[in-house]
Amino acid sequence: GSRLIRTNCSFSKADEILVNRLEACINSASALAREVSNKRAVIAGRITCARADWGRDARFQFYGEQAVYLSDTWVDLIWLEQFSEYEELKLALRAVRQVSVIQTVAHLSLKKDRQSLEILDQLKELMSLGATFVGLMIDSEKSISRDQLQDLIDELGILSLILDFDLEKEAFSRISDSIH
């Protein structure tokens, strides 16, 4: 069975009406995850990027509200994911830290033009702001080299890596070898 179950309460524009029922959605997702895990998996409550057309204060409040709801449902982790803008991820992390002490994973979606030193500095800053674990979400095996990945692991100790692409056997073997 799964060792980690993430709840998913992100909404598309078509689901905007559900934002008003955010607390109920989060409570239901967390309860279902707890039930199916039978206390044998870590339950992570997922928070994704808020709508870009909302103001900064509204986005901060949105992240904080979700963190409160997730904290109330006793998730084991708060999982920040699908943030391609570093400043937005910092905003979300600050909102979470203001209302919750639950361990938090902060994932930065990697853009192809990023430099590894810049990424390393940003991930370190996220940890100094209260992220328990940091990670990258990559959409191509060419997004980060083996050496860059190893540098990040050496510096940070633990790095969560989400691969958002289909792996061919050969590509999987190369990535797997670079991690071990």
For each feature predicted by the language model, list its residue ranges.
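Domain-level signal for soluble alpha/beta catalytic cores
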Residues: G1-H180
